[in-house]
């Protein structure tokens, strides 16, 4: 569910802004409903649901929409979505993890496989790349919230494990179990985050220094992210600033 010189989760969206927002809310609602169905429909008693609700709030999703998504699960309404993770290699050999929630496994698998094959990638088997990532909590803030030292001190006091700061913003990493508590503590000091979610963090990064390769990689990620069933695309790529400037 954005590529720059410091690996980041990619959320390139095409089309009108309202269409992008609608698609984002749809994906957020789907995650909330699935999380509520898998556990208790109470964010305080369901860690995954807490993360999903926090992510929705960070994107300014209306409270009524959030509650409807939870009610859909507790009321037994809605489609039965299956959680699937796809793993593969993109242009330049970068590792990609694609998280999907689908009511039609065959449709989603076909779409994901086609996206990889048409954009210089290769869909792998389960576990083929995830061994190179850690499963963690991620809290994101825009650059304007403060300088690197300010955010680092706030994150340290909140109990975070690590911080990555760049011109694009601040990524604060936590264990999955402490994500909710750290997010609450940070909100008291820095304000509402722009993203709170479960994430895949690469243990090693792969540099893509060729402009054409980077462009094809972004096209692949855009294609995947535009699929309604795809929730999030994670990667271990790192794009040098000079290449990003050429790509605009």
UniProtKB/Swiss-Prot annotation:
What does the entry list under GO cellular component?
Answer: cytosol
Kindly report the protein's main subcellular placement as a broad class.
cytoplasm
Where does this protein have coiled-coil stretches? none
One Pfam annotation, family name?
Answer: TACO1_YebC_N
Q: Which InterPro entries match?
A: Integrase-like_N, TACO1_YebC-like_2nd/3rd_dom, TACO1_YebC_N, Transcrip_reg_TACO1-like, Transcrip_reg_TACO1-like_dom3, YebC-like
Q: Which GO MF terms does the UniProt record name? A: DNA binding
Q: Where in the cell is it found?
A: Cytoplasm
Question: Per its UniProt record, what Gene3D superfamilies does this chain match?
Answer: 1.10.10.200, 3.30.70.980
- Keyword presence, tRNA processing: no
Stretches for region Disordered = 1-22
Keywords of the record: Cytoplasm, DNA-binding, Transcription, Transcription regulation
The protein's matches in SUPFAM superfamilies, at most eight in alphabetical order, are given as: YebC-like
Q: Which family does it belong to?
A: Belongs to the TACO1 family.
Q: What PANTHER family does the record point to?
A: TRANSCRIPTIONAL REGULATORY PROTEIN YEBC-RELATED (PTHR12532:SF6), TRANSLATIONAL ACTIVATOR OF CYTOCHROME C OXIDASE 1 (PTHR12532)
Q: What is this protein called?
A: Probable transcriptional regulatory protein Sala_0337
Instruction: Give the species.
Output: Sphingopyxis alaskensis (strain DSM 13593 / LMG 18877 / RB2256) (Sphingomonas alaskensis)
């Amino acid at each position: 569910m954005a590529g720059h010189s410091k690996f980041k989760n990619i959320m390139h969206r095409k089309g009108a802004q309202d269409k992008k927002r609608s698609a984002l809310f749809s994906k957020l609602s789907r995650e909330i409903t699935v999380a509520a169905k898998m556990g208790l429909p109470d964010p305080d008693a369901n860690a995954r649901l807490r993360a999903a609700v926090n992510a929705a709030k960070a994107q300014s999703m209306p409270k009524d929409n959030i509650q409807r998504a939870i009610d859909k699960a507790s009321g037994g309404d809605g489609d039965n979505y299956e959680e699937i993770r796809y793993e593969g290699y993109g242009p330049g050999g970068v590792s990609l993890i694609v998280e999907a929630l689908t009511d039609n496994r065959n449709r989603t698998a076909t779409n994901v496989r086609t996206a990889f094959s048409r954009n210089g990638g290769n869909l792998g088997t389960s576990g083929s790349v995830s061994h190179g990532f850690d499963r963690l909590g991620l809290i994101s803030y825009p650059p304007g919230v403060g300088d690197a030292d300010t955010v680092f001190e706030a994150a340290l006091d909140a109990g975070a494990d690590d911080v990555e700061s760049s011109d694009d913003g601040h990524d604060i990493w936590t264990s999955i179990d402490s994500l909710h508590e750290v997010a609450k503590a940070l909100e008291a000091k820095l304000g509402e985050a722009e993203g709170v979610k479960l994430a895949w963090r690469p243990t090693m990064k792969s540099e893509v220094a060729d402009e054409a390769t980077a462009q094809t990689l972004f096209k692949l990620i855009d294609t995947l992210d535009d699929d309604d069933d795809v929730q999030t695309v994670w990667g271990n790529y790192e794009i040098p600033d000079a290449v990003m400037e050429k790509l605009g």
